[in-house]
């Protein structure tokens, strides 16, 4: 049969308690020594008996080991402080971002003409100046686009007029050939239809969807 499990509790008998202390103390010191040798660990052990007597073991200078422990403990505490500082920093940055978002939202509402009751006369004047500058930029861009569109339509007008001149020349040539009985009536009518279709394209562009007047053009008539 194996040994029964010993209940861990305070030994009431003083003699037995002292004997047990000596045995366990020696075993503990032996284990500390073995740990330092086998594992190349820095070990320091301090034991105070119930009578106040001190027993110690260290494979290094015990004071040096204690100082090393204090430093390690201090670094650990500072690490916790660093984490707290970082947490506070991110909380402050988050609050700043929320404030900036709120300011931008208020600014957008003001630009839309909303929530103006809280603004002073000076702030309203500043808002008015911002809107006027914005309108000026918008009008400038609009004018730029209109000029580009008019320029394109003018170029297209010239192209169509050149086509019209070319077709007038062709129709005159066909008429001469018809008079000489070299072109049939069917072919002549087909050419006339083609000329008419191309001739009316400039007029369609004049009344296009832009809604902006074009410069006066010289209209060429066929025939």
UniProtKB/Swiss-Prot annotation:
PROSITE patterns in the cross-refs: K_BOX, MADS_BOX_1, MADS_BOX_2
Known tissue expression: Expressed in flowers and seeds. Expressed in endotesta cell layer of developing seeds.
Location of the MADS-box domain: 1-61
InterPro entries named among the record's database cross-references: MADS-box/MEF2_TF, MEF2-like_N, TF_Kbox, TF_MADSbox, TF_MADSbox_sf
SUPFAM superfamilies cross-referenced by the UniProt entry: SRF-like (SSF55455)
Keyword entries, A-Z: Developmental protein, DNA-binding, Nucleus, Transcription, Transcription regulation
Transmembrane portions of the chain: none
Protease recorded as keyword: no
Record SMART domains: MADS
Pfam family, one: K-box
Positions of the K-box domain: 87-177
Main location: nucleus
MF annotations from Gene Ontology: DNA-binding transcription factor activity, RNA polymerase II-specific; protein dimerization activity; RNA polymerase II cis-regulatory region sequence-specific DNA binding
Biological process annotations from GO: positive regulation of transcription by RNA polymerase II; regulation of transcription by RNA polymerase II; seed development
GO cellular-component term (any): nucleus
Compartmental location: Nucleus
Functional note: Probable transcription factor involved in seed development. Plays a role in seed morphogenesis by promoting the correct development of endotesta cell layer, which directs the further development of the seed coat, the endosperm, and consequently the embryo.
Protein name: Agamous-like MADS-box protein AGL11
Originating species: Vitis vinifera
């Amino acid at each position: 049969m194996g040994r029964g499990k010993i209940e861990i509790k305070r030994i009431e008998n003083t003699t037995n308690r002292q004997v047990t202390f000596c045995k366990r103390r020696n075993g503990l010191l032996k284990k500390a020594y073995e740990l330092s040798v086998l594992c190349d660990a820095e070990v320091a052990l301090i034991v105070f008996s119930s009578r106040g007597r001190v027993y110690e073991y260290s494979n290094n200078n015990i004071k040096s080991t204690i100082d090393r422990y204090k430093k390690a403990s201090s670094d650990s505490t500072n690490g916790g402080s660093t984490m707290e500082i970082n947490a506070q920093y991110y909380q402050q940055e988050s609050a700043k971002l929320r404030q900036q978002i709120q300011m931008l939202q208020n600014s957008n509402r003001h630009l839309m003409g909303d929530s103006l009751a809280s603004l002073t006369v000076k702030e309203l004047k500043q808002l008015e100046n911002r809107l006027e500058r914005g309108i000026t930029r918008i009008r400038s861009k609009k004018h730029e686009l209109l000029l580009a569109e008019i320029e394109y339509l003018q170029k297209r007008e010239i192209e169509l007029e050149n086509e019209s001149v070319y077709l007038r020349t062709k129709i005159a040539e066909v008429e001469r050939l018809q008079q000489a009985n070299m072109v049939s009536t069917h072919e002549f009518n087909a050419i006339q239809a083609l000329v008419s279709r191309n001739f009316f394209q400039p007029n369609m562009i004049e009344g296009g969807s832009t809604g902006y007047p074009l410069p006066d053009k010289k209209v060429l008539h066929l025939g």
